[in-house]
């Protein structure tokens, strides 16, 4: 109760079902956004790809106290439904939620209105993203190698409690993919 879960499948599949009658299979590049709210029974079973490998993320979010007892809700977005924008330098951004570079991600009606992005920065490129004045940032390099200017965590991880109105710089070391989340709410600790 009182949470949101956000599985993002990069490789393999996740079979899922819940007490509201939602069921299906999340394939590579797909995302699910489940708001547990007042309560839901939910199950997931990962299945590897042809090589038996499963790769992805499962982020959990705590709903604001005023929304803890909201009605349960489920959104399943296939990879083809998630927009990808490409900059002149080859940087590609898959927009799962929020608005970025003039496009909006398909997941909507989310408690904290986050930006949730899958960012590819090509080798030799340094990319700067401006953070809205009311957001905090979390980023993790999960493929290749990269670093963040002035990051508070180890190389490849950015964990910033206060980035509002600042810039997040992703510096490539060998071409990377980075999971980025800008959001509101309690401090990240």
What are these model-derived regions, one by one?
Residues 1-189:
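Jelly-roll (double-stranded beta-helix
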């Amino acid at each position: 109760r009182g949470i949101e879960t956000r599985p993002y499948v990069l490789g393999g599949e996740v079979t899922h079902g819940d007490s509201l009658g939602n069921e299906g299979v999340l394939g590579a590049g797909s995302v699910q956004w489940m708001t547990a709210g007042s309560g839901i029974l939910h199950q997931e079973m990962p299945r590897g790809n042809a090589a038996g490998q499963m790769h992805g993320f499962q982020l959990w979010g705590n709903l604001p106290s005023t929304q803890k007892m909201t009605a349960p809700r489920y959104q399943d977005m296939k990879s083809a439904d998630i927009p990808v924008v490409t900059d002149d330098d080859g940087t590609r951004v898959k927009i799962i939620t929020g608005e970025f570079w003039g496009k909006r991600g398909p997941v909507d009606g989310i408690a904290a209105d986050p930006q949730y992005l899958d960012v590819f920065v090509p080798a030799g490129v340094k990319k700067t993203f401006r953070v809205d004045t009311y957001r905090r940032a979390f980023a993790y390099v999960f493929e290749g190698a990269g670093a963040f200017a002035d990051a508070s965590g180890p190389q490849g991880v950015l964990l910033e409690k206060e980035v509002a109105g600042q810039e997040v710089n992703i510096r490539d070391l060998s071409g990377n993919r980075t999971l980025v989340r800008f959001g509101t709410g309690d401090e990240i600790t």
